[in-house]
A protein has these predicted regions:
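Nucleotide/pyrophosphate-binding catalytic subdomain
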Residues: 1-252, 337, 342-347
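Short phosphate-binding/catalytic loops that engage adenosine nucleotides
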Residues: 19, 265, 327
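Glycine-rich beta-alpha junction loops
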Residues: 28-29, 216-218, 271-275, 286
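Short gly/pro-enriched beta-turn/loop segments at secondary-structure junctions
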Residues: 205, 262-264, 296-299
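A conserved active-site cap/scaffold subdomain adjacent to cofactor or substrate pockets
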Residues: 235-283
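A conserved regulatory-domain signal marking ACT and ACT-like small-molecule sensing domains
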Residues: 278-363
């Protein structure tokens, strides 16, 4: 959600739904990074954060003027302006002018980074004339191993309670942000957590489907930035999707798959800007392609196939063919539908185009 055009596309997509929908929104594109940058500037006693804050405010106000109906703009501007110029500015000013203890800084950082979703959800709620819901009221985390992790059972119960009974035509809530179950402090589900929030809600409610609208057509057989001829994967099993995400595909935040897999919720990944493109359906049925896709992360490459593929034979063939190009790979992990290979003498991303070509030949 980075522009007026994308938000108007969201409005059109929601308007074509024939049953009640819950819309889970992320921050406007780039805003989370700006919030983090302003926090660090303020901690460094650098007043340059004020210029970025003004840019953030201007951008939100400009979007309001283009997407929110005229009769609701004043209310939306008042909320967004108060939140930015009072709440957000006040926290940044406190960090800039005071020596704040480290534990409080961490709490404030989590609060500041949550503002992006709160602001965008206010705009989308007003744009759609929807019913708002505050996600931290039902998305809960707990401390484990020094980190904030989802309190899954509590979250599931609270979602059922929050959304029990008849639903309004359109509900809007925030992705990513949460509250600690014990302290009620601001926390979050990690970058990419908006997909995860949507999956948790869909799973808890037994939704008809989960639709993840993004800026690509769906899952592709490789990263199109390095393999321009990468093809759209029309269908994936939950396990195949998990392996692609775990192997480096960034289309969907990796933890998103587990809740919908466990509850058997069909999940579509589609392009906001090209809604007529079929997209990728993630469900019980696996892709019919012998070789589904290849992804890379750090120094590893993961190849995802059908379950009935001979992975050992495929891995041996890939290693033999690539060794003739001076590229050495060793197998390091395997699932029923994937094999992960470690690259010993270079970066995995540079190997992906060649491997993709070899895999297509293998078919």
């Amino acid at each position: 959600m980075g522009s007026v055009d994308s938000l108007l596309k969201v409005k059109d997509i929601v308007g074509h739904q024939n049953e009640p929908v819950i819309v889970v929104v992320s921050a406007l594109g780039g805003v989370t990074n700006q919030l983090l940058a302003m926090t660090e500037q303020a901690l460094s006693k650098d007043s340059a954060y004020e210029a970025t804050l003004a840019l953030v405010a201007d951008r939100h106000m400009d979007i309001i003027s283009h997407v929110v109906p005229a009769d609701r703009q004043a209310e939306c501007r008042e909320f967004v302006g108060e939140f930015i110029n009072s709440s957000l500015a006040g926290m940044l000013r406190m960090l800039c002018l005071n020596d704040v203890p480290a534990d409080i800084v961490e709490d404030m950082r989590k609060s500041i980074v949550s503002f992006g979703e709160i602001l965008s959800s206010a705009i989308v709620t007003m744009m759609l004339d929807a019913t708002p819901r505050f996600a931290p009221g039902f998305i809960k985390t707990k401390r484990s191993g020094g980190e904030d992790v989802l309190d899954a059972e509590l979250t599931r119960r609270l979602i059922k309670s929050e959304f029990g009974g008849s639903q309004p035509p359109t509900t809007v809530t925030q992705g990513f942000i949460a509250h600690d179950a014990a302290t009620d402090k601001d926390t979050n589900l990690g970058r990419g957590g908006s997909d995860y929030t949507a999956a948790l809600i869909a799973a808890a409610l037994g939704a008809t489907a989960l639709e993840i609208w993004t800026d690509v057509d769906g899952f592709l057989s490789a990263d199109p930035r390095v393999v321009p001829e990468a093809r759209l994967i029309s269908k994936l099993s939950f396990a195949q999707a998990e392996d692609l995400c775990n192997g480096g595909a960034k289309v969907v935040y990796y933890p998103t798959i587990a809740p919908v897999r466990d509850s058997r919720i069909p999940t579509w990944v589609k392009n906001t800007f090209r809604p007529d493109v079929t997209g990728t359906l993630i469900g019980d049925e696996m892709s019919t392609e012998a070789v589904v896709g290849v992804t890379s992360k750090d120094d590893t490459v993961t190849v995802v196939t059908r379950v009935d593929a001979d992975l050992a034979l495929l891995a041996d063939e890939l290693m033999r063919r690539l060794m003739s190009e001076g590229i050495v790979l060793i197998p390091v992990a395997r699932t029923p539908q994937s094999v992960t290979l470690r690259l010993l003498n270079g970066q995995a991303a540079t190997v992906v185009p060649l491997m993709h070509k070899l895999l297509l030949e293998h078919e």
